[in-house]
């Protein structure tokens, strides 16, 4: 159980798809002008990557390695199609706001990368938790980016006005340049945090080794 928790939590910060692995930055930039859009896209990717990891792990021994990538993409496309149909039926407004980027989930680097590097080499349960962790990390990153951009770009969070009518919004925050700048700062913050945690881990390890000596 502890091993599964470690697999899950690495996707949150230590190997966050956006802030550490720097995968799927284009949709991260395009769909995070508001917190709702970022969160919704994150949930969609969470569902797709978790389901795809599970399916790939199940079929890994019966798929010819020479055609594995087309098979993985077909699996992803099938799951994404289901997500699109559900959103068209129950959340048409969000579906329109996400636009073509929802369909492009099929070729998101993070989904194919986890299928290739983890799910195709590990059992079903660890693959499920890997997809769940990476999906949660992706959702967390997109939601944080969306909240900050919406807060400073329109003075609201999840559509709720925070600063009042007198606030003069920084429109650059809801434009691509502002998104790039923000992502850069967040990547730097996460990098410093990970380095700090690694340093603490090494210090504990040195103390433990010293104690044994």
Swiss-Prot record:
One of the protein's GO biological processes: electron transport chain
Keyword Membrane attached: yes
Alphabetized InterPro entries for the sequence: NqrDE/RnfAE, RnfE
Entry membrane topology: Multi-pass membrane protein
Keyword Cell cycle (UniProt): no
EC number(s) from the headed UniProt entry: 7.1.1.-
GO CC terms, sorted: plasma membrane
This protein's UniProt keywords: Cell membrane, Electron transport, Membrane, NAD, Translocase, Transmembrane, Transmembrane helix, Transport
TM segment ranges: 11-31, 39-59, 69-89, 93-113, 128-148, 170-190
Subcellular location: Cell membrane
Domain of life (superkingdom): Bacteria
Subunit structure: The complex is composed of six subunits: RnfA, RnfB, RnfC, RnfD, RnfE and RnfG.
General function of this protein: Part of a membrane-bound complex that couples electron transfer with translocation of ions across the membrane. Couples electron transfer from reduced ferredoxin to NAD(+) with translocation of H(+) out of the cell. Essential for energy conservation during autotrophic growth. Contributes to ATP synthesis during heterotrophic growth.
Family (UniProt): Belongs to the NqrDE/RnfAE family.
Record NCBIfam families: PRK12405.1 (NF009070), rnfE (TIGR01948)
PANTHER family documented for this protein: ELECTRON TRANSPORT COMPLEX PROTEIN RNFE, ION-TRANSLOCATING OXIDOREDUCTASE COMPLEX SUBUNIT E
This protein's name: Proton-translocating ferredoxin:NAD(+) oxidoreductase complex subunit E
Lineage: Bacteria, Bacillati, Bacillota, Clostridia, Eubacteriales
Gene: rnfE
């Amino acid at each position: 159980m502890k091993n599964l928790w470690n697999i899950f939590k690495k996707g949150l910060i230590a190997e966050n798809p956006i802030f550490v692995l720097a995968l799927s930055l284009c949709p991260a930039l395009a769909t995070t002008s508001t917190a709702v859009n970022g969160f919704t896209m994150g949930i969609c990717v969470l569902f797709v990557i978790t389901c795809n990891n599970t399916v790939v792990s199940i079929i890994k021994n019966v798929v010819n390695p020479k055609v594995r990538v087309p098979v993985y993409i077909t699996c992803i496309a099938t799951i994404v199609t289901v997500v699109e149909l559900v959103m068209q039926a129950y959340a048409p407004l969000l579906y329109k706001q996400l636009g073509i980027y929802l369909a492009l989930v099929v070729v998101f680097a993070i989904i194919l990368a986890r299928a290739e590097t983890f799910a195709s080499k590990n059992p079903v349960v660890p693959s499920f938790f890997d997809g769940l962790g990476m999906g949660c990390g992706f959702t967390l990153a997109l939601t944080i980016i969306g909240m900050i951009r919406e807060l400073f770009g329109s003075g609201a969070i999840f559509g709720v006005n925070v600063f009042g009518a007198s606030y003069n919004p920084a429109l650059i925050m809801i434009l691509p340049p502002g998104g790039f700048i923000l992502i850069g700062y967040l990547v730097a913050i996460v990098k410093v945090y990970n380095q700090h945690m690694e340093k603490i881990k090494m210090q504990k390890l040195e103390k433990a080794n010293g104690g044994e000596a």
